[in-house]
Structure formats: structure tokens, C-alpha cells
């Protein structure tokens, strides 16, 4: 009983947590397998940001309980945000789950599985479900292990645990990596359950993060994405500003100085974290990719106040304009919630106008979801579902049109692309531009991990297609 499959729901933070758990388990002698049908232990790392995410995981767990009836030694565990949010109450719906572990206890999973395995091997009944959702000081420092494919068996899952190359003799090398720098959130947005599921804001020591990035570079990683619930708040309680430079920008500077790291990204920030020092960093740190995920949530000042979001539409637009002044080809993505309680047609129109003006390349548009225990859930002015759906579809159509137009502008330009590995078909290769655009192209395995010049020959709404340039960069980008 040592084959483990981890299925991850939700954000990049969850992906990184799953990778760390997988690496810890592998170090204890467990095998991480890509196919859930081949496992003895299945762990669901869950999301709670919307009710639909929880229901999806509950549905999957309910289905897996049937497997336990046929396979008594099969172990089912629920990890992460839903485990933290619901705790032992999950057993009302899922009585056969063996393990429920919250967001500050991921590092305890190997020990709990060791105990379960020892009991099974000894023929001892398991007894009560293990439930551990307590807070633990220093837990932010435990998400540091990486499951690099070159260190794993050919049937193991790579770092994202969702992108296994089917049919390969061995997994491709890992070129990109997530690095957790901060956990928790103190923002208390009226719609959000994250402070409950992730706890208070906690940052890792800067030296530890830099050392982790240095080790990744030595193992072939060329791009790192720094992760945190509010990543721009990194270190504000632990470090001081130096010459007007925030701790987060100081961290960017140190990672930027590392040999081998060619690109730096980060997510998810908060608009209030974009002070002059961070904006200026885009002009003086060339490894910092010209792509910003900048959550908007609403373009109405009235709704922003109701959401407890401490900025205005005017300030948000100032940030976008300031970043584009530093880099004219800056790419933007965002988060928007439609149908927040009390949102009127006028409020939504203000959101639509700002959404259009900011010229986003990508957006995650969500219908407001009631989350029990949040201030917004108690409001009596909930927006009807059909109105939410109408507003949602309108913004998605605007996004589709804008993405199609902006991608079309890239036709016959030459983009710098980091070759990440074979695409899903295994017939071609994939990589991303500095602006986070996915590209598909023909290449050779020796180019994996290298920055190449790609002439864009075809564009869809979400993907670029191109051909390698043997020399030169071609004409300048023409972005509008």
C-alpha cells in the first residue's frame, strides 16, 4: 500500500501544496502515480473559494467511497481548503473518508499515511477518521519540497501533478516551478473565505526562498513563479523598507540576481501592493515578465466598498496605465465577480466600461457564490441567478473578442518563448511568451529549457502557433 495519486482542485497555491506533499511522500518511500486507477491511496487537495468547487470535490469523494467497498484497503483522504473549512462535518456526507487534513498540516500527511499503512499491514482495524485542521506556527515554511521529474520514476506525476506526458519513456525535465513565499491573508474581503481556510498572513524567510530558487536553477528550472495569497504583502511584518524598496521587491531583486533563472512571475497580488517601487521594478528587472495578474473584482466604487476592497476604480486604472508606461507591451489578466449582493445595472455597467478600457488579455469571470461565514452571505440583496449569468456571459464575450484581437496583432511578429516540453499530443512542443501566451510549434528535444525566437503564424483566442527562427528576432512587436 504505497502507490499514491493526488488530485488537485483550484489555484496554483493548491498545485504547489500538492507537489510538496508528493515530494514528502516520495522521500518516505511512496510512489506517486499519474493514474488514479493504479493507486492504493487517493488524496483530494480541495478548493473552497466557491461552492461549486466544494461540491465537485464532494461528488468525487462520494464516488470514490464506492471503491472502498470493493477494495477495503484503499485509503481516501481530503486535504486543503475544504478540509480546513468543513473539518469533521465532512463525515456527515462522506463517512468512509480516512483522512481530513487542513492547510497548515500538509507536512503531517506522510506520518498519518505511515500510521494507516502500519495498521493495515498488521491487520488492525483503522477506527476513527484522522482529522487535523489545527493551526501550526511556522507551517508556511513546510511547503518547500519539489517533485522534479528527473528525480522520479517514469510513472510519477510531475510538479503540477496534472501534466504527465503520456507514453514517454521518462518524464521531460522540469523547466518551470512554483515557489511558495507566503501563506494566509489578512484582507477580509466581504465575499472571500480564504482568511478562514488559509489563516493569517505568514511569510517565509527571504534567505530560504532565495536558496530554494537557487537549488531549482541548479536542477534545470529556468522560470519561477512566486506564490502567495497576497504575494505583494510578502515580508511586511518581518522586513523593513530599504531606500523605499518594499520587502517583496527586495525579494524580486535577489531572485533576479540568480544565475540560471531566466524568468520571474508572481501571483496573486493585490492592487494596493502596486506602489512606485514595484511598478519601477518592471523597468529595471528584465527577468521580471511583462505579465501582471491584477484582480479587479468590480469596476464600481460602491461595490468595491461593499466588498471591503481598499482601492477605487480610478486608482486601479492608474496602476494599469503606470505599468504600461514602463512596458508598452505589458499583458494583463484579472479576476471579476459579477452579481455581488446589491450590484445594480449601473454598477455592472461601470465594471463593463473599466473591463473594456483595461484591454485584458485574460480574465477569470465568476458569478458571485455565497460562502457561509462571510459578511456578504448575510446580505439580503442577493442578485438573481439569471442576472448573474447574463452579466457573466457579457464579460466573457468581451474577453473573447479582445483576446482574439490582441492575439491577431501578434501574427508575423517574433516572440521570445521558453520551450517547456512536448504538447499534450506529444507531436509538437509547447512554451509561453513573456506575456504568458501559450505557443505550439515544432522543435527538437534539445531545445527544452531554452529561450527561442518564434515567428507567430497562426492565432486562436487562447493559443499561438509558430515556427522557430534560426537567427534574429525579426520586427518589433506591434501591441495596441
Curated annotation (Swiss-Prot):
Location within or outside the cell: Cytoplasm
Xref: Gene3D superfamilies: Methylthiotransferase, N-terminal domain (3.40.50.12160), tm_1862 like domain (3.80.30.20)
Organism field: Opitutus terrae (strain DSM 11246 / JCM 15787 / PB90-1)
Bias type Low complexity, positions: 149-159
Protein name according to UniProt: tRNA-2-methylthio-N(6)-dimethylallyladenosine synthase
EC number annotated for this UniProt entry: 2.8.4.3
Family: Belongs to the methylthiotransferase family. MiaB subfamily.
Function: Catalyzes the methylthiolation of N6-(dimethylallyl)adenosine (i(6)A), leading to the formation of 2-methylthio-N6-(dimethylallyl)adenosine (ms(2)i(6)A) at position 37 in tRNAs that read codons beginning with uridine.
Amino acid at each position: 500500500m504505497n502507490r499514491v495519486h493526488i488530485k488537485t482542485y483550484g489555484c496554483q497555491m493548491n498545485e504547489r501544496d500538492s507537489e510538496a506533499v508528493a515530494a514528502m511522500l516520495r522521500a518516505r518511500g511512496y510512489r506517486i502515480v499519474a493514474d488514479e486507477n493504479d493507486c492504493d491511496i487517493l488524496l483530494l487537495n480541495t478548493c473552497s473559494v466557491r461552492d461549486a468547487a466544494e461540491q465537485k470535490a464532494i461528488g468525487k469523494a462520494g464516488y470514490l467511497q464506492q471503491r472502498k467497498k470493493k477494495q477495503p484497503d484503499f485509503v481516501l483522504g481530503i486535504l486543503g481548503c475544504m478540509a480546513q473549512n468543513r473539518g469533521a462535518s465532512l463525515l456527515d456526507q462522506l463517512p468512509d473518508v480516512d483522512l481530513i487534513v487542513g492547510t497548515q498540516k500538509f507536512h503531517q500527511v506522510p506520518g498519518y499515511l505511515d500510521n494507516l499503512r502500519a495498521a493495515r499491514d498488521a491487520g488492525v482495524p483503522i477506527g476513527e477518521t484522522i482529522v487535523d485542521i489545527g493551526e501550526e506556527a511556522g507551517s508556511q515554511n513546510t511547503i518547500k519540497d519539489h517533485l522534479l521529474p528527473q528525480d522520479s520514476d517514469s510513472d510519477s506525476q510531475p510538479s503540477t501533478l496534472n501534466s504527465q506526458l503520456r507514453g514517454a519513456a521518462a518524464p521531460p525535465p522540469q523547466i518551470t516551478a512554483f515557489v511558495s513565499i507566503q501563506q494566509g491573508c489578512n484582507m477580509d474581503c466581504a465575499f472571500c473565505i480564504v482568511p478562514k481556510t488559509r489563516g493569517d498572513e505568514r511569510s517565509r524567510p527571504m534567505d530560504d526562498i532565495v536558496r530554494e530558487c537557487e537549488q531549482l536553477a541548479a536542477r534545470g528550472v529556468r522560470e519561477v513563479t512566486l506564490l502567495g495569497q497576497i504575494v505583494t504583502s510578502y515580508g511586511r511584518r518581518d522586513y523593513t523598507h530599504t531606500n523605499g524598496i518594499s520587502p517583496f521587491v527586495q525579494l524580486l531583486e535577489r531572485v533576479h540576481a540568480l544565475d540560471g533563472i531566466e524568468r520571474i512571475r508572481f501571483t496573486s497580488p493585490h492592487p494596493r501592493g502596486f506602489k512606485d517601487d514595484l511598478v519601477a521594478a518592471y523597468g529595471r528587472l528584465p527577468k521580471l515578465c511583462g505579465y501582471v495578474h491584477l484582480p479587479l473584482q468590480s469596476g464600481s466604487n460602491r461595490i468595491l466598498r461593499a466588498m471591503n476592497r481598499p482601492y477605487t476604480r480610478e486608482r486601479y486604472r492608474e496602476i494599469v496605465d503606470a505599468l504600461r508606461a514602463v512596458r508598452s507591451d505589458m499583458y494583463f489578466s484579472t479576476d471579476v465577480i459579477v452579481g455581488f449582493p446589491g450590484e445594480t445595472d449601473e454598477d455592472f455597467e461601470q465594471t463593463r466600461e473599466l473591463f473594456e478600457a483595461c484591454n485584458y488579455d485574460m480574465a477569470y469571470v465568476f458569478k458571485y457564490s455565497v460562502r457561509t461565514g462571510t459578511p456578504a452571505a448575510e446580505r439580503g440583496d442577493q442578485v438573481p441567478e439569471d442576472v448573474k449569468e447574463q452579466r457573466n456571459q457579457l464579460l466573457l464575450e468581451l474577453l473573447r473578442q479582445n483576446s482574439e484581437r490582441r492575439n491577431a496583432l501578434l501574427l508575423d511578429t517574433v516572440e521570445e518563448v521558453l520551450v517547456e516540453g512536448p504538447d499534450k499530443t506529444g507531436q509538437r512542443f509547447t512554451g509561453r511568451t513573456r506575456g504568458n501566451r501559450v505557443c505550439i510549434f515544432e522543435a527538437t528535444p534539445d531545445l527544452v529549457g531554452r529561450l527561442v525566437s518564434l515567428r507567430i503564424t497562426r492565432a486562436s483566442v487562447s493559443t499561438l502557433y509558430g515556427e522557430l527562427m534560426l537567427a534574429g528576432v525579426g520586427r518589433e512587436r506591434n501591441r495596441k
